[in-house]
C-alpha cells in the first residue's frame, strides 16, 4: 500500500510554511492553539479539492483559509508526494472564493484559473500516474483528531483577548 511520503504547505491558516516527511503512522501532538488542528485541516482541504468540493469548503470566506488573510498571504500552496505520484496546487483569493493559480500532476501543468480540480479530466490523457480520489492509496488515509476538553484544558481557561497571535 502506498502512503503520503511528503507534504509541503504554505499559507494555510496558521501555517506560514511547513514541510513534513510522513511515515506509516504519524502522531501529531501540540498544545491548544499550536496549529495541530490546522495541520489536520490541510488533509481536509486536500480531500475537498480531490472530490470537487473546494467551493463548499471555502464557503465564500477565502480569508479564513489564508495565513492572516489575503492582505498578508494572497495564496496558499500544497504539494504532496505519494510513491511515484506527485500532486500540487496553488489557490489564490479572487473576490469571495479561491481559484487555482495552478494545478499540476507531477511536472505536468493541469490548468489555471479554475474553481474545482481538473485532475480527473486529465487522467485518461496523462502518460504519468495520476493522483486522484479513487486510487486505493487515498482509501487508506485515516485521520483521528482528539481534543483535550477537560475542565483543566487551556481552552477552557481565562485568556487575554488581545493575545491573538
Label every PLM stretch briefly.
Residues 10-14, 81-83, 106:
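Short strand-coil-strand connectors
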Residues 35-36:
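Conserved lysine of the Walker
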